Regions:
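Specific transmembrane alpha-helical segments of multi-pass solute transporters/efflux pumps
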Residues: 16-22, 50-99, 135
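Specific alpha-helical transmembrane segments that line the substrate/conduction pathway
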Residues: 36-47, 83-117, 122-123, 158
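Glycine-/small-residue-enriched transmembrane alpha-helix faces in small-molecule transporters
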Residues: 1-36, 144-171
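Cytoplasmic-side transmembrane-helix entry/capping segments in multi-pass membrane proteins
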Residues: 11-12, 63-73, 118-131, 151-152, ...
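Hydrophobic transmembrane alpha-helices of multi-pass small-molecule transport proteins
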Residues: 49, 69, 109, 118-140, ...
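Membrane-interface helix-boundary motifs at transmembrane edges
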Residues: 56-63, 112-121, 143, 167-180
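Juxtamembrane C-cap of transmembrane helices in multi-pass membrane transport proteins
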Residues: 21-32, 44, 80-90, 98, ...
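Transmembrane alpha-helices of multi-pass small-molecule transport proteins
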Residues: 31-78, 105-109, 161-165, 182-183
Length: 183
């Protein structure tokens, strides 16, 4: 398989995994509290990453550890709990749509808080995505007015956490191997 085709296959697989996580959170909340579910997600991810990337831990410098800690906090810890709590009151589809605000939040935070610059095509792509997200959110609100949309703010905060994580990695950890960062 050519490199370009392989990238599309891997992107498709990744999309299925990430997309299914929202419905799996909703299903997990049937038998678990949001705190239990968030904790299990963090424990399983941490266990898997330690198994896969234990050797790369020694390559992390003392200076990089503070940014690794921040990326773990913003990229995994906080969102795991926020999504679980939010989905006690909103549908998994609403949660996944609101999570699509992450690229917009990444762009805005990157420009304002991290001093990063973005290309015109990236900005256009984010605007198109924002329009699509807004249309889907409006449609969901009209079709399910009984949901407590205040809980949607938790998903937006989680999206801002993801955006903070992406910008921290880009600004402070871009020279590191990805496995070292995630482990």
């Amino acid at each position: 398989m050519e490199s370009k085709q392989l990238k599309w296959v891997l992107l498709s697989i990744l999309s299925l995994i990430w997309g299914s996580s929202f419905i799996l959170i909703k299903k997990g909340l049937i038998g678990l509290s949001p705190i239990q579910l968030g904790s299990l997600r963090i424990l399983f991810a941490g266990f898997f990453l330690i198994l896969v990337g234990f050797k790369s831990l020694s390559k992390i410098s003392f200076q990089q550890w503070k940014f690794i800690t921040l990326t773990a906090f913003f990229g995994t810890f906080i969102p795991a709990y926020l999504f679980a709590i939010a989905q006690t009151e909103i549908d998994s589809s609403v949660s996944s749509i609101l999570n699509s605000l992450t690229p917009l939040n990444t762009l805005v935070l990157g420009s304002l808080a991290f001093g990063l610059h973005f290309r015109r095509n990236q900005i256009i792509g984010v605007i198109i995505g924002l329009i699509g997200s807004a249309l889907l959110i409006l449609n969901g609100a009209m079709n399910h007015p009984e949901q407590n949309y205040y809980y949607a703010l938790l998903v937006i905060i989680a999206s801002i956490c993801y955006a903070t994580n992406v910008n921290l990695v880009k600004k402070h950890l871009s020279g590191m191997a990805p496995l070292s960062i995630t482990t």
